[in-house]
Amino acid sequence: MIIRSPEPEVKILVDRDHIKTSFEEWARPGHFSRTLAKGPDTTTWIWNLHADAHDFDSHTSDLEEISRKVFSAHFGQLSIIFLWLSGMYFHGARFSNYEAWLSDPTHIGPSAQVVWPIVGQEILNGDVGGGFRGIQITSGFFQLWRASGITSELQLYCTAIGALIFAALMLFAGWFHYHKAAPKLAWFQDVESMLNHHLAGLLGLGSLSWAGHQVHVSLPINQFLNAGVDPKEIPLPHEFILNRDLLAQLYPSFAEGATPFFTLDWSKYSDFLTFRGGLDPVTGGLWLTDIAHHHLAIAILFLIAGHMYKTNWGIGHGLKDILEAHKGPFTGQGHKGLYEILTTSWHAQLSLNLAMLGSLTIIVAHHMYSMPPYPYLATDYGTQLSLFTHHMWIGGFLIVGAAAHAAIFMVRDYDPTTRYNDLLDRVLRHRDAIISHLNWACIFLGFHSFGLYIHNDTMSALGRPQDMFSDTAIQLQPVFAQWIQNTHALAPSATAPGATTSTSLTWGGGDLVAVGGKVALLPIPLGTADFLVHHIHAFTIHVTVLILLKGVLFARSSRLIPDKANLGFRFPCDGPGRGGTCQVSAWDHVFLGLFWMYNAISVVIFHFSWKMQSDVWGSISDQGVVTHITGGNFAQSSITINGWLRDFLWAQASQVIQSYGSSLSAYGLFFLGAHFVWAFSLMFLFSGRGYWQELIESIVWAHNKLKVAPATQPRALSIVQGRAVGVTHYLLGGIATTWAFFLARIIAVG
């Protein structure tokens, strides 16, 4: 029996008036650092100011103070998000054709931006249908608004104003919880309470309130919209909420109220909580009744999950106990000590969250097209392509961020003296085996995946198609993927007897959903071409992981530099006296990892874009004949490198290259400009600091001659700064180029 001393009933969890609000201090650049606060001597000062402004670890070593700054900054972030959302809704209310789109979503394109004629750029206002001229948008907001039950621009105005009020509230909260009532460290470390509140509150009640909104507002309004009722004739949301008889006309079970719920006769509610699977043939989106059911189920799960952890009542799980019990036969002390790491190192915590959120974002990308959740989303090809591309890039960046913060944790927060034989220590002790094996896997994947393409290019060049790897010659069918597809396609009659159709049309079966003569979704065939490109995916992902993991595992020490931890997270080289020690810092691994992340995601979005245009997207005739945008050329063209260059990059770039003089010309200019930004990055990546310092000193000499030399001494960028500027422009230029290429193409042909 464990006897615990009685704890005081009320814990004081905040400090009052912790730090005074001082505009004078905020107005002094670099007030958070003694060195920076002195002001600039050289131009390096402005770079250090940006690098360290949010590096709270460098301001103080007091964990409580760091925690408060991070917490306060989160409210600032939320404020910006609300401001951004407000802007999106305001554009929908003020500058868009939302009401026209709502009345005819198959013939009218979504637009929420009208360009003002200043120097003739009103050419950008294309005809999106219904007599409206503006820029076609591909964010998916219109489809989201329709699914939420928004029927007028006035409702968008009200939401925009509401979001502005919330933005102001968040700004106030950020100030209040740092200056007026700052939480104590114990509050940030009370993980059980945090889990309960986040699970039950954010996820549980959040899902429940969304399910409630869907049932009482979205479902009835969408029911009317689908039946072709004029949006102006549809009752307003509060009428559905307050008048049960109105809902009962659409969903008879509403007449019975809550009786079926308390008598456990839940199947009565199956008229608005369904389990159908597949897509609604009217809108090409998931059944909104399925979505409502899903959110209700999720809410129940998370409300239960939010009552599992031990807080004031002495029952439930303790996270420390769970982690310390977590050990297997070959894992030594297992997760012992992990609780302390995750409650004292916010970098470790953030790393874990970024890895999870990044993976989840990529999962979202894949579900948005295979199970399109909003009405008329699946037939808006530009939006589909944009949503996939956007979520893939974001996921890639978040995963690299996970490695970055894992490495910062290793350098700044990891204490090797207190860790022995737990899982992390054991991983670090056999890091050589991990990295060398991973390196072997990368070499194997690289040579074999690329080798298959090179073989095909060679055979194609020699005029020997019968010797190529293709669906019509030597087949390399992705049999495991096809088996998984088939299993899911057959699920409704086997493992999921309650469902009418399988979760996604992409699995297989004969179903095709078309809306307004355009294909929403159909079974996606996988063949040799997909087998080849999937191994390129495997290769690029493994190389990215190799670089990032090496950075984390060797962040503190390596055979080359045993005292690396003393040099910090980012440093250019191990001092001037040691050659061959550049690009070894943990920061440099993140820098290099970003390039491979860019490679990996580029191949994924290229694969997706071409595959969908070739095998899914297109029009359907009255006889039911489908004509795809690129006529199914993916299977035979994408099996050679030449095919990718000729039939994808070059053939599909014609729209962006020929966009001048049309409403798509902005994409042509972006395509050009973003190429320029990308090329500009190479100047930073391929030249050293000394070259620029020499040039600068010559320019300073000229300024002195003319007596216009500045007081602040100009300096070349440091090595690390140059790399940071380089990789930023490389990624920005590359992503913007791809964006212009994709959108000009898909808006023109989609």
UniProtKB/Swiss-Prot annotation:
Binding positions (chlorophyll a'): 675
UniProt protein name: Photosystem I P700 chlorophyll a apoprotein A1
GO cellular component, one term: chloroplast thylakoid membrane
An MF annotation (GO) of this entry: 4 iron, 4 sulfur cluster binding
Main location: plastid
Chemical reaction(s) catalysed: reduced [plastocyanin] + hnu + oxidized [2Fe-2S]-[ferredoxin] = oxidized [plastocyanin] + reduced [2Fe-2S]-[ferredoxin]
Residues bound to chlorophyll a: 683, 691
Subcellular location: Plastid, Chloroplast thylakoid membrane
Lineage start: Eukaryota, Viridiplantae, Streptophyta, Embryophyta, Tracheophyta
Its EC number(s): 1.97.1.12
Source organism (scientific name): Daucus carota (Wild carrot)
Role noted for this protein: PsaA and PsaB bind P700, the primary electron donor of photosystem I (PSI), as well as the electron acceptors A0, A1 and FX. PSI is a plastocyanin-ferredoxin oxidoreductase, converting photonic excitation into a charge separation, which transfers an electron from the donor P700 chlorophyll pair to the spectroscopically characterized acceptors A0, A1, FX, FA and FB in turn. Oxidized P700 is reduced on the lumenal side of the thylakoid membrane by plastocyanin.
GO biological process terms on file: photosynthesis
Top-level EC class as recorded in UniProt: oxidoreductase
Superkingdom of the source species: Eukaryota
Keyword Chloroplast: yes
Cofactor binding note from Swiss-Prot or TrEMBL: P700 is a chlorophyll a/chlorophyll a' dimer, A0 is one or more chlorophyll a, A1 is one or both phylloquinones and FX is a shared 4Fe-4S iron-sulfur center.
Disulfide bonding pattern of the chain: none
Record keyword Transcription regulation present: no
Oligomer and partners: The PsaA/B heterodimer binds the P700 chlorophyll special pair and subsequent electron acceptors. PSI consists of a core antenna complex that captures photons, and an electron transfer chain that converts photonic excitation into a charge separation. The eukaryotic PSI reaction center is composed of at least 11 subunits.
Chain residues that bind [4Fe-4S] cluster: 573, 582
Stored PANTHER family: OUTER MEMBRANE PROTEIN, OMPA-RELATED, PHOTOSYSTEM I P700 CHLOROPHYLL A APOPROTEIN A1-RELATED
